[in-house]
C-alpha cells in the first residue's frame, strides 16, 4: 500500500538492560526491591525477596524473535502449540538496548518514530505492592536508568515514557515534576488500583487529586498500558503473571481475558468517578489493551447515566470519547473500533519487538484498507503526534470544571 504520509508507531518496547533496576539503587535496599539470583544456571530477578518467574529469561539474551506468535494470534490455522514458536531464539539485538540503533531500525521499517514502553517495568509493580515505599524506590531508580540510556525524547523520533505509580501520591507528584523537567512527552502507568500504606485505593480517589491536578495542568498524556495489573481470576485460575515453558503444555485459560478486564474496569471506574468532569484536560491513551471491551463499557455507561441522571453532566460516552484514545490489538477489527471511537481517537501500535507483535510494524497496513485516506492518516500518524504534544492549561477550579 502506497502512503502519502509518515507512520508513527504508538506501541514499541525496549528490553531492559541488566542493570536497569539496580544501577541507581542502593544495594542495601535490594532485599526490598530488585536483586539478581542464579538458580540452576539461569538468572532470575528477585522482587521483594521472592524469585520472579514472570518471564522465562529476564536477561533477554537469547530472546524469541519479534512477532513469533503472529500466526497464533491471527487464528492459529495450523494448530501449532505456541510454546514451540517461542523456542526459536536469537541473540539480543542492539536496537532493543540502544536508541541510536533503534533509530536506524525505525528508518529500515519505514517509521517516522515511535512511543517506547517498558517490558519488565510494566509487570514489576504488582509483585512489590505489599511495600509501597519499595515500589517508589524501585521505579525512581528505574526511571533514572531510563533517562540515561534512552532519554525521554531521542532526536524527536523515540519518545520514551517514564513509569509512574500512585503507591505514594507525594512521590507520584515529585516524580511527575522530575519527568516534566526531563522533557518527558508522556507517562505510563498500569491499569490497576494502587496499594498504599493505608491499603488498596481506587486511582480516582480524591486523595490522589494532587497528582491528577498536576497532570491536568501540564496537559501531558497518561498512557495506560497492558501490564500485570493484579486482576484476579477469583479462583478460576492461579493468579499471578507467570511464564513457564518447561511445563511444555498450553491450554486455554480465563486469565487470557485479564488484560481486557483490567482496562475495562479502569476506564469504567474513571468515568463513573466523574474524573473527566473534575479534570477536563486529561488525555488517556489505552495501549496494548485491545478494544473488544468497548461495546460493553459503552452499554454500562449509558445504563448508569439513566440510573443517575445528571451525574456525568454530559453524555458519558461522548465524554469518554473526548478524553480517551484507543490502541487496538492488530487482530481487532479496525473499522469497528473506528466506528465506536471515531478515527481521531484510534492509534496504531505494533507492540514491536515483543513475541505477540507484528513481525514488522507496517504489516498492519492491510488492516487500514477500509478507512478513508484522511482517517488512515489520523490512525497511523496524526493522533500519535497529538498525544505527544503537551496541552498545558491553567489550573482548573471545581467551578471551571463544571462549566
Predicted regions and their residues:
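Catalytic pocket-lining loop regions of alpha/beta-barrel enzymes
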Residues: 137, 150-151, 156-159, 164, ...
